[in-house]
Amino acid sequence: MAEIKNYTLNFGPQHPAAHGVLRLVLELDGEVIQRADPHIGLLHRATEKLAEHKTYIQALPYMDRLDYVSMMCNEHAYVMAIEKLLGIEPPLRAQYIRVMFDEITRLLNHLMSLGSHALDVGAMAVFLYAFREREDLMDCYEAVSGARMHAAYYRPGGVYRDLPDTMPQYGESSKYRGEKDLRIMNDARSGSLLDFIEDFTNRFPACVDEYETLLTDNRIWKQRLVGIGVVDPERAKALGFTGPMLRGSGVAWDLRKMQPYEVYDLVDFDVPVGVNGDCYDRYLVRIAEMRESNRIIRQCVEWLRNNPGPVMVENHKVAPPKRTGMKTNMEDLIHHFKLFTEGFHVPPGEAFASIEHPKGEFGIYLVSDGANKPYRLKIRAPGFAHLQSLDEMARGHMIADAVTIIGTQDIVFGEIDR
């Protein structure tokens, strides 16, 4: 009798559930996974090497393009590493703005993660609902930086500019959008950015309730997630898990609480933790994190309303001159030109800065030789540690469960391939 052998299947890199350019080589016994071999590198752009040939400010936009769903959080770790080497501290208002936008970015990331995960499993409505809320948050990015995704808003020593007093309005009516629709859409945009964000934070808890109504007690959703991809706490720590992946396994580790940076020690929030370490618990952790991020944003909005002040450090070697001065003063124009073409020199040394990124612990290790460019930049991407556990998490599961596991890992290849 002929021996029945396992067969090998290519999953991706063109598969819609591969979250980018993941290529998985699956060894299958029938439809049960015996081995999962992730192939990475299809989105490698040599970010770490490119940064060595740019000044510290010119390398900043590369950070946005790492995890291109959590743009400002990537920038945050990078500017914190530079600030450590320079020995400077941004003004308190700039720190609150950074924390507020870190949490807006966390919402952007978790909404994308939740929507795409639900879509992978077969629930299409949640994806559309999540993108409805992401649109408002993208408008916040656009209001402060002019860009909806790659903001380049954080700067060594603070942020690019203070929060605007006006929000962009929707334009003329069309056959798709009448005058009444325009009035409703522009109603929340009649005030400042802080008014717009406050209006969003008032609406958002009800939106999260909508997602939970659709998913949390949904029989099919629970059948697809409960007991899938279980990782116990000890194994999660051994594999290098961080963020929701670690907290979903029951380990209450959050850098915002354990090693507070910026003003996280001045805001009130809780760290949600799972119990079983399966895909369902990780989903619940992300849902709870969205509620906590909303709380933090509300506190930041209240503080920023009552405390005007500078948003950039008073150090002219690092901070650019004011735009108004450049129009009348030749020295300011020369200063601006030299700062952005030649950059600033950073004292020799090394620094590591890590933040609680939406996906986990995102770190930047920066080595300076005293020049105006980094001597070495090393990126610690949380998704890299999560992806290497895919083989272990998927063994013994069906092919359909591999899709669920990839979704729960919240993988973005910009940061994994770098």
From Swiss-Prot:
Its main location: membrane. Keywords: Cell inner membrane, Cell membrane, Membrane, NAD, Quinone, Translocase, Transport, Ubiquinone. InterPro entries: NADH_Q_OxRdtase_suD, NADH_UbQ_OxRdtase_49kDa_CS, NDH1_su_D/H, NiFe-Hase_large. Pfam families: Complex1_49kDa. PROSITE patterns: COMPLEX1_49K. Transmembrane segments: none annotated. GO terms for molecular function: NAD binding; NADH:ubiquinone reductase (non-electrogenic) activity; quinone binding. It is a peripheral membrane protein. It is found in: Cell inner membrane. Signal peptide: none annotated. One of its GO terms (cellular component) is plasma membrane. It catalyses: a quinone + NADH + 5 H(+)(in) = a quinol + NAD(+) + 4 H(+)(out). Its EC number is 7.1.1.-. The keyword NADP does not apply. Disulfide bonds: none annotated. NDH-1 shuttles electrons from NADH, via FMN and iron-sulfur (Fe-S) centers, to quinones in the respiratory chain. The immediate electron acceptor for the enzyme in this species is believed to be ubiquinone. Couples the redox reaction to proton translocation (for every two electrons transferred, four hydrogen ions are translocated across the cytoplasmic membrane), and thus conserves the redox energy in a proton gradient. PANTHER family: NADH DEHYDROGENASE [UBIQUINONE] IRON-SULFUR PROTEIN 2, MITOCHONDRIAL, NADH-UBIQUINONE OXIDOREDUCTASE 49 KDA SUBUNIT. NDH-1 is composed of 14 different subunits. Subunits NuoB, C, D, E, F, and G constitute the peripheral sector of the complex. Belongs to the complex I 49 kDa subunit family. This is NADH-quinone oxidoreductase subunit D. It comes from Bordetella petrii (strain ATCC BAA-461 / DSM 12804 / CCUG 43448).
